[in-house]
Regions:
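ABC family nucleotide-binding domain
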Residues: 1-172, 178-179
Length: 180
């Protein structure tokens, strides 16, 4: 993990200000949570860090480097969304492996990395299934494993526990904490 800094970050759409002048430093290995009502800018802030939204003003630094002009793929950020984003035609194994293929990671390491990530979120027995054969909680864990397998510099998670049952929330919280 690396330090993430937001310096005077603002996001506007016309006259509407979605995020107003955020100054924030998230230190290396620090775990933070954005709390607030719907529409207050939590997701927008994470999307700007990930490069999915451009800030209207201010700078975003990852590892001390301004990343405002970098494409999302070049920021070394993994983001887990509330709505999974799984590929329905791929197995759980293939969904987890997908980021490794896209980034052209040495194929010799794929199997071990996929199985380790799947094991971390208790999916080891489900690797041959397709998303339609999984519960909502299992799908969310596939999305989490897909982020874990990348070994990114920064993890962003937008309500990663929202579709999990109470028992899995407890264990998944511990697994997320272990990512630090």
């Amino acid at each position: 993990m690396v330090e993430v800094a937001l310096k005077g970050v603002t996001k506007r759409w016309g006259s509407f200000v979605g995020v107003r002048s955020i100054d924030l430093v998230i230190r290396d290995r620090e775990f933070i949570v954005f709390l607030g009502p719907s529409g207050c800018g939590k997701t927008t802030t994470m999307r700007m860090i990930a490069g999915l939204e451009d800030p209207t003003e201010g700078d975003i630094l990852i590892g001390g480097k301004v990343v405002n002009d970098l494409e999302p793929k070049d920021r070394d950020v993994a983001m887990v969304f509330q709505n999974y984003g799984l590929y329905p035609n791929l197995t759980v194994y293939e969904n987890i492996r997908f980021p490794l293929k896209v980034r052209r990671v040495d194929t010799a390491s794929h199997d071990a990395r996929v199985r380790k990530a799947a094991s971390m979120v208790e999916l080891g027995d489900l690797l041959a299934r397709r998303p339609k054969e999984l519960s909502g909680g299992q799908r969310q864990r596939v999305a989490l494993a897909r982020a874990i397998v990348r070994e990114p510099a920064v993890f962003l998670m937008d309500e990663p526990l929202s579709n999990l049952d109470a028992k899995l929330r407890v264990s998944t919280r511990a697994q997320i904490k272990n990512l630090q």
